């Protein structure tokens, strides 16, 4: 059997002591610098215009209603889905998408240059908020521009719901025949009148609806739009549905009467129901 040489053996206690001291010193450092969870981190990009904020910071800002959160996407994108509380500062639809003069000029006209504000758009790969932040600094002297660069995709991925406005609801209703519309009103109101092919899901029913067929269990990416007589109730139900991994869920910012009175869609048309049923029906197979 091989044995450790005497000369080497002398260093084993010394090495063990050094290692022990290393861990003793390191432990307080680790305690002081804990690894942040996903809600408390950002992309950590270096040398970019505007300081990044985390999702947790954005939640706090939205709750306090300050600083303003500015969504710099196109109006239709915003209407279909946006972070609740965000304000749309749209681009000039006729301009080069890389030209952000319209958006930066609009922001400069609304807010003082020393005011903090948050820019957001379509997530980590969206360069729009960076370009607007740079234009605000270079052209208008803004000094406190923040960016939620994680944007709408990560906001949703972390289980947060989003808001759909009337134009966005109509766009989804008229074009997306796989979308599921959830009526969060009382069952008696739902039975009396509702959107064609809607399902009734009440507060605290998301667990049951996830498995009983009311929600598309096997298609978590399907759009799920919740409406009610009170947008706040729709938001509560939509938030609960989002927590069941329906990352493309949202709530309607108006009420059922707004949907009934809309000229952009016929909410009682069952044409979309038949198309949706056909798309979700499995083809029949011969027994041969």
What positions do the PLM features span?
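Short loop/turn hinge sites at secondary-structure boundaries
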Residues: 64-65, 176
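Mature N-terminal segment immediately following signal peptide/propeptide cleavage
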Residues: 52-62, 68, 72-75
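Short, charged low-complexity linear motifs
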Residues: 63-64, 141
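Rhodanese-like catalytic fold shared by cysteine-dependent sulfurtransferases
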Residues: 6, 23-52, 79-116, 123-180, ...
